[in-house]
């Protein structure tokens, strides 16, 4: 997350000494010398997988499974508080190495999102947690501008599958599926270290319309594209896989 208002290092250290403090807008506490006191999260996203196409009413939908992975020293955890009819503002909770946590204002918003009856109706999800895009790849292998994007913007943060075991990774789920109560004033979402939130290719809006496209493209998935979450590494939030369109069932160009 890019810095918004700079905070003197001494003030950050004083904030870290508090067990649970809501802070004013600050620079990323997971960057700089003070980060050593924190178990900062880090989100990554795996390359698109299980890719296939589906033709629907003249559209050609390129579908793929997404895997948002928690790979930092601590969990990615958001605390939402209602600020509108179907929206919540959030604070991010970051745990301290010696116990306790700090709470910092986050730029992330939660939206009560409908995903169809087959997938359970509506859930509180993080708005713009990830996006999918297609970029044309030239004969020289250079990746160009975005040509198509997915309509999907909102995602849960949850412990769905434990995808990387380790000493910092809990064996059992800590963060359940997203809340479905539209009247809740507060909710918590998160993904533990070593766990993933995975959406199958057949999920609601898990596609890009590729009708009419021909040639080689980079299918990119980006987590936290707006950089509204505090992480220890902002440079590993994108993955991609090359695909040739029309798609013939195998990645690569």
Predicted regions: what they are:
Residues 8-19:
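Bacterial N-terminal signal peptides
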Residues 20-24:
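Sec/Tat signal peptide C-region and signal peptidase I cleavage site
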Residues 77-130, 150:
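Short coil-to-beta strand junction motifs in C2/discoidin
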Residues 129-130, 138-213, 251-252:
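Exoplasmic/lumenal beta-rich domain surfaces
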Residues 132, 213-223:
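A short tyrosine-centered beta-strand micro-motif
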Residues 25-78, 252-253:
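Boundary/junction segments of secreted and surface-exposed precursor proteins
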Residues 27-32, 37, 74-79, 140-148, ...:
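Beta-sandwich strand segments
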Residues 98, 231-253:
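Short beta-strand elements
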């Amino acid at each position: 997350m890019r810095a918004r208002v700079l905070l003197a290092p001494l003030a950050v250290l004083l904030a870290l000494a508090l067990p649970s403090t809501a802070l004013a807008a600050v620079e990323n506490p997971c960057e700089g010398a003070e980060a050593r006191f924190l178990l900062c999260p880090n989100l990554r996203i795996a390359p698109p997988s299980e890719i296939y196409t589906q033709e629907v009413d003249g559209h050609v939908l390129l579908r793929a499974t997404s895997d948002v992975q928690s790979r930092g020293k601590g969990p990615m955890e958001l605390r939402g508080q209602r600020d509108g009819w179907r929206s919540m503002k959030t604070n991010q909770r970051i745990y301290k190495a010696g116990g306790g946590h700090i709470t910092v204002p986050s730029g992330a918003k939660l939206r009560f999102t409908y995903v169809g009856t087959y997938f359970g109706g509506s859930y509180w999800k993080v708005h713009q947690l990830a996006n999918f895009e297609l970029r044309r790849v030239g004969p020289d292998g250079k990746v160009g501008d975005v040509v198509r994007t997915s309509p999907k913007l909102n995602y849960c943060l949850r412990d769905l599958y434990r995808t990387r075991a380790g000493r910092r990774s809990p064996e059992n789920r800590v963060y359940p599926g997203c809340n479905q109560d539209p009247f809740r004033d507060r909710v918590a979402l998160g993904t533990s270290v070593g766990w993933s939130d995975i959406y199958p290719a057949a999920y609601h809006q898990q596609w890009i319309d590729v009708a009419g496209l021909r040639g080689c493209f980079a299918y990119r998935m980006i987590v936290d594209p707006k950089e509204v979450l505090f992480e220890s590494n902002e440079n590993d939030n994108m993955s991609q896989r090359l695909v040739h369109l029309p798609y013939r069932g195998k990645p690569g160009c």
